[in-house]
Swiss-Prot record:
Family to which this protein belongs: Belongs to the polysaccharide monooxygenase AA9 family.
GO molecular function, one term: metal ion binding
Residues binding O2, per UniProt: H166, Q175
InterPro entries per the UniProt record, alphabetical: AA9 (IPR049892), AA9_LPMO (IPR005103)
Region forming the signal peptide: 1-19
GO cellular component, as recorded: extracellular region
Name this polypeptide is given: AA9 family lytic polysaccharide monooxygenase C
């Protein structure tokens, strides 16, 4: 009996872990790059646990303390860049992408993206049907975004964020799975990205896109947290 209970517990734990995500790989020109080669190693590298405190400084890139250095990948403005997850996305919720420009003369890998430096470039939420909401990102292992064509040349952090909303009916129940890739954009334009926000600071735990009951009382429309998407 004890063996059966232990086996059931292990299966349950494994199932929960498999529903969690990390994004260790950039996808550029159709090629999946190496684990953490161009992505800052995240603190949940082994645990796969999501963040639940939107006021934590870990909301920037969820970096692992003392992480090894990552390199910078050159990408073209207007091109499609992606992140690969090490497991299919099981939890329902939106995916958002942000960028932050590294100041000229600063080392990309050691730069801390504090203050109002982040601008949103894409967000993907649910699709409404007669049976309720469906989430196009569910069960996906690769998520893509187009780098804005008019973004100025330079070094940037590209931040992916998937918000799991299965327990979002409680304050602190939403789980944030995120990572930051390090890219150098070439062939860009003279756009002025914005509005810019900070992490932490861009979200509140009671924002309607973070605190909501998708099981008992789902809202008519999903409200994304954070700023408007820059139409660059």
């Amino acid at each position: 009996m004890k063996a059966a209970v232990s086996l059931a517990l292990l299966v349950a734990v494994a199932g929960a872990a498999s529903a969690h995500n990390i994004f260790p790989n950039l996808i550029v020109d159709g090629t999946v790059t190496g684990d953490w080669e161009f992505v800052r190693t995240t603190a949940n590298k082994w645990s796969r646990e999501g963040l639940t405190n939107v006021n934590s400084e870990s909301m920037r890139c969820y970096e692992e303390a003392g992480r090894p250095p990552s390199e910078v990948k050159t990408v073209k403005a207007g091109s499609r860049v992606g992140f690969a997850s090490q497991a299919p996305i099981r939890h329902i919720g939106p995916v958002l992408f942000y960028m932050a420009r590294v100041p000229d003369g600063q080392d990309v890998d050691s730069w801390t993206p504090s203050g109002d430096v982040w601008f949103k470039i894409h967000q993907q939420g649910p699709e409404r049907s007669e049976s309720g909401w469906t989430w196009p990102t569910q069960d996906q292992t690769e998520l893509f975004v187009d780098i804005p064509a008019s973004v100025p040349d330079g070094n940037y952090l590209l931040r992916i964020e998937q918000i799991a909303l299965h327990d979002a009916q409680y304050v602190g129940g939403a789980q944030f799975y995120l990572a930051c890739g390090q890219i150098n954009v070439t062939g860009g334009g003279s756009g002025d990205p914005g509005p810019k926000v900070s992490f932490p600071g861009a979200y509140k735990p009671t924002d309607p896109g973070i605190l909501l009951d998708l099981h008992g009382h789902p809202p008519a429309n999903y409200q994304f947290p954070g700023p408007a998407v820059w139409q660059g």
